[in-house]
UniProtKB/Swiss-Prot annotation:
This is Ribosomal RNA small subunit methyltransferase G. It comes from Rhodopirellula baltica (strain DSM 10527 / NCIMB 13988 / SH1). Specifically methylates the N7 position of a guanine in 16S rRNA. InterPro entries: rRNA_ssu_MeTfrase_G, SAM-dependent_MTases_sf. Its main location: cytoplasm. Keywords: Cytoplasm, Methyltransferase, rRNA processing, S-adenosyl-L-methionine, Transferase.
Length: 231
């Protein structure tokens, strides 16, 4: 059964999951918290935080990916968004890249424990792109927009787009990235904004340059970056 506190958190924040999916996500969170006692992986160690800070990001991201896509979670850390994404979307292929060896080992143990067909690479994502191609790279809380664009700049032939989960500082990060010229030749769009408080999630689309309501501290944002010359 789904834990009563988990179910209450889902209901409180307007989210619904079927029983098998809820059980899988519950097992992931509980296993993650168990490993967290040995190695620092997450500060989101309550059901409320798991739902509002982890699950909501993944639910929004899952809506933006097409069936059959090959997705790399770059700098996976505690497995968010990659592991929940693999549970939410079994019709896609997800791989995790984590350069910190201890964390990569935990991620490998987690996906084995959860019986997920998710390879874990103890490597930097940009190094993986030397040998592997993906449809989409996803990431959360791994460097600024400037740093991320610099990391992947030599490897655009190895993937089609970036989907980056960001918080209220994304507008400042965009300004910094523009100042350093790393957005030249790229198209940046806000493809999702959603509340992180007690309001039910919503999906909104906007073109770059629109009024950045998403910069509000209570909202999450997903940015999509593509090459302008890509169809």
């Amino acid at each position: 059964m789904i834990d009563a506190e988990f179910k209450t958190a889902l209901e409180q924040f307007g989210l619904e999951l079927d029983e098998p999916l809820g059980m899988s996500l519950q097992q992931y969170a509980q296993s993650l918290w168990r490993y967290n006692e040995q190695i620092n992986l997450t500060r989101h160690t309550t059901w409320d935080l798991f739902v509002t800070r982890d699950l909501r990001d993944c639910l929004q991201l899952a809506q933006l990916i097409q069936p059959g896509e090959e997705v790399l979670d770059m700098g996976s850390g505690n497995g968010v968004p990659g592991i929940p994404l693999a549970m939410l979307r079994p019709d896609i292929d997800v791989a995790l890249a984590e350069s910190v060896g201890k964390r990569a080992k935990v991620l490998d143990e987690l996906v084995t424990e959860l019986n997920l067909p998710v390879p874990v690479y103890a490597a930097r994502g940009e190094d993986l792109l030397e040998d592997f191609r993906f449809t989409t790279i996803v990431s959360r809380a791994v460097g600024s927009l400037l740093k991320f664009c610099r990391w992947v700049e030599p490897h655009w032939s190895q993937f089609d787009r970036l989907l980056l989960i960001k918080g209220p500082k994304w507008v400042d990060e965009r300004g910094e990235a523009r100042h350093h010229g790393v957005l030249k030749g790229l198209e940046l769009r806000v493809v999702a904004t959603y509340p992180l408080g007690s309001v039910a999630p919503e999906l909104a689309e906007a073109e770059e340059g629109d009024s950045p309501e998403a910069a509000d501290a209570s909202r999450g944002v997903i940015l999509e970056l593509t090459k302008k010359n890509k169809g």
